[in-house]
Regions:
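Beta-strand-rich interaction surfaces with strong enrichment in secreted/lumenal proteins
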Residues: 72-73, 114-120
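Short beta-strand and strand-turn-strand segments in soluble, beta-rich domains
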Residues: 105-115
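Buried hydrophobic-core signal for structured, non-transmembrane domains
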Residues: 18, 83-87, 145-149
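Short, polar/proline-rich extracytoplasmic segments that appear immediately after membrane translocation
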Residues: 1-56
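C-terminal, structured domain-capping segment
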Residues: 90-92, 121-153
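Short acidic, flexible loop segments centered on an aromatic residue
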Residues: 33-35, 92-107
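Beta-sheet-dominated interaction scaffolds and their linkers
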Residues: 35-90
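Intrinsic-disorder/low-complexity, polar/charged segments enriched in Ser/Thr/Lys/Arg/Asp/Glu/Gln
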Residues: 25-27, 80-84, 125-127
Length: 153
């Protein structure tokens, strides 16, 4: 009986003890799918400015190509391209979509309302326009290295 009482006392102490953190290992599976099956689809807009949003290498990595020789655009200019590409929410819930530029001159490019975010319902699309301001830049400056398109439920 004293041994049983000691065992219960130890069990109670363990069961009521506090802890500050817990760690657990879980398995996760992430599959890459083609754009037609993705939760967000990017497509060139079906209009004249959609021609600037190109998959030059055929690898699904789109680029904004403003000249056929990829030399760039003039300095001290402002270029606005309406309706360049479309983002479609193919998921099962609404998401807030934002575009963030990565590079040295991200303040010189804007993606309209997607700079601060826009909510897309299931099946909804948004057409993205691009504004580029090269004032203050010099010949050879690279405006962006890449963009991140984020979707948060």
């Amino acid at each position: 009986l004293p041994l049983l009482a000691l065992g219960l006392a130890a069990l109670i102490c363990v069961a009521t003890g506090a802890f500050t953190s817990v760690s657990a290992v879980r398995a996760a599976e992430v599959n890459v799918v083609g754009d037609s099956n993705a939760l967000l689809t990017l497509t060139p807009y079906n209009g004249p400015n959609g021609a600037y949003f190109v998959d030059g290498n055929g690898d699904g990595a789109y680029e904004l190509a403003l000249s056929s020789d990829h030399r760039g655009i003039n300095v001290n200019a402002t270029i606005v391209l309406h309706d360049v590409f479309t983002i479609t929410n193919n998921g099962t819930q609404q998401v807030r979509v934002t575009i963030t530029g990565i590079g040295d001159h991200t303040n010189n490019i804007s993606f309209g309302s997607l700079d601060t975010g826009m909510t897309l319902g299931v099946g909804q699309s948004v057409t993205v326009s691009v504004r580029i301001d090269t004032h203050g830049l010099t010949d050879g400056d690279r405006i962006l290295d890449s963009i991140i398109i984020s979707a948060e439920a």
